[in-house]
Each structure stands twice: as C-alpha cells, then as structure tokens.
Amino acid sequence: MKRPVPCLLPGLLLAGAACAQPTEGGALRNWFDDPFLALSRDQAGCPEPAGPRVSEAERRTQAHRRAEKGTTCWLAGEPDCAQSSAYRYDAGIADAIRADATLGATLAGSSVWITVQGRVVYAEGCVRDAAQAEALERRLRALPHVQQVIPLLRLQAGQPPPYRVFPGR
C-alpha cells in the first residue's frame, strides 16, 4: 500500500549552494554499489552530480545506518517490507526506471541523473521548469516499492545546483 508522502519539491528546489560543493577528504566512489543512472543529458552546462559517490570517511559514517535501514518494518512484518533490507529493492527500482518508456517525453530538454538508495529515489540535475520537475517526481513516485522521491533539480541555468557536484565533470 502506498503511503502519501508530502511534496518536498519547493523546499528542495531552493536548496543552497552549500550542497553543491565537492566532498572533501579523498576520491569519491560508489562504495555501496547504489544504482546510479543518467536518464537524460540534453541540457548543456548541467553539472554531473556526485550521486552515490562518497569519500572513504563518508562511507564509514554511512555504514551503520545503512545496515539498519529497512529492517524495522521487515521485523514488524509490515506488508510492504518483504525484503530484510530496504536496499534489496534498489536494483529492481532502477530496472523499473530504465524500463519506463514514458520517462523519455517527461525528460525532454533536461539532464537528470537518478540514484536509488534504500527505496528512496534521488533525482538530480537540471530541468526546463517546475512543471517538468513535478511530472518527473510524480512518475518516479508511482513506481512499485518507491517510498520517497527527493528532487534536487536546478530550474534555471546559472544558478548553483542544489546537489553535490562530481569533481572534474
């Protein structure tokens, strides 16, 4: 059963430039093999997000939380938590996103990358306008097993992106 999730779009679209700084403390790497995919690359000048790539120090910080995420609802026997970890759903969610033929039209003129982490879908990149961002968020939220969608999308060229940028890209 889908639970309603409050719309986070307005607040997240206004995220500050502090979020856009590259991570300090070493090379970034996708330590946990979280699904990370480019859905579109139509908007020139849109910086590639760091996505799930983090430093060694950040990996150590995340490890404990990630080990526990999703086990509470599974242990309670909730019907939408058949897997023992929320991260076990991620590959299937990413496959559903790749297979969704309707996303192509939704993303025209944008550059969007997706990260899936523990049934949460992060949409990062640059879109034409708020309507396109809202359509993408609705489409992603409708996919099976997605608990939350977090849109970190730049609406206007020249503004700092509301996400961490992958250094050197």
Spans of model-derived segments:
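N-terminal targeting leaders
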Residues: K2-L8, L13, C19-R169
